[in-house]
Amino acid sequence: MTISKGTLATFVLALGGGSALAQSIEPRAYSNAPVGMNFLIAGYVYAEGGLEADASVPLTNANLQVHTTVLAYARSLDLWGRSGKVDVMIPYAWLSGDADYVGQPVEREASGFGGPRLRVSMNFIGAPALSMEEFADYQQDLIVGASLQVGLPTGQYDADKLVNIGSNRWFVKPELGVSKAKGPWTLELSTAATIFGDNEDFYGGQRREQDPIYSLQGHLVYSFRSGIWAALTGTYFTGGRTTLDGVRGDDLQKSSRVGATLALPVNRRHSIKLYASTGLSIRTGTDYDAIGAAWQYRWGEGL
């Protein structure tokens, strides 16, 4: 009775702020799974805290409460003899909060879909494409892989509001990851760059540009014989300076987060994941606490 590695979707704030996306935490992203397996994931995250705002916008003391539900599908693939995966995630969120705008208190409520996210990943070293029967004898050592995620510029968005659920821009996130197993322990490291398109209809009709956000993430995972696994995570990110109508903002981000994940098998097809994270050191950008849960159902030939 095991929970397949790397198949539970990442759950992050479905807001337009770039740093919330860059702070996403996902242990076991680079691991092996039998070819042809399908995964359906439904999840919920509650997050509360500050939000990313441009230095040129007089918004201070911001605090948001965000309830996010996520539906995702993933499938493991054979990519030229190496294991891979494709997944798609669609978030829906409800947010409410308050802040001070030009010294006056303001409030905001919104709900709607966030932009869908598509990702393809491939393991280059240490994770060959295997059938369910072959996978029974597989033992992980060192895995090296990469992924490419794309976010679509759709979802709820109102240019007359500073805070929205959709982002009204594309993003592309290439990532490189390494995973080393020794006994029940696995150490994982990954580095990524989140590259943003321009929002040509930002608040007040302005054009908003944002520099890439670079991140470094580490996980220490312990796997129990029962199929339960637990992970501690630390992530650091920097970059993301914004430009509004050609004017550079003084909002370089340089922050870190810590988190924990617990994955529990229910039976051969069903599993549950519990998750929590918090800001550790925040210079500029999104500072929030989050807790969540996800349910996964898997099916495929040989299961």
List the model feature ranges, each with a label:
Residues 21-41, 126-140, 300-303:
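Outer-membrane beta-barrel biogenesis signature
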Residues 25, 203-303:
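Outer membrane beta-barrel transmembrane domains
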Residues 36, 63-71, 111-118, 142, ...:
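Residues that define the transmembrane beta-barrel architecture of outer-membrane proteins
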Residues 40-46, 86-94, 144-152, 189-195, ...:
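Transmembrane beta-barrel strands of outer-membrane/channel proteins
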Residues 42-44, 71-75, 118-124, 148, ...:
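Residues on the lipid-exposed face of transmembrane beta-strands in outer-membrane beta-barrel proteins
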Residues 47-68, 105-106, 159-166:
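Surface-exposed strand-loop-strand hairpins of Gram-negative outer-membrane beta-barrel proteins
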Residues 50-51, 81-84, 128, 184-187, ...:
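Repeated loop/turn-to-beta-strand initiation elements of outer-membrane beta-barrel proteins
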Residues 94-209, 250-251:
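Outer-membrane pore/translocation modules
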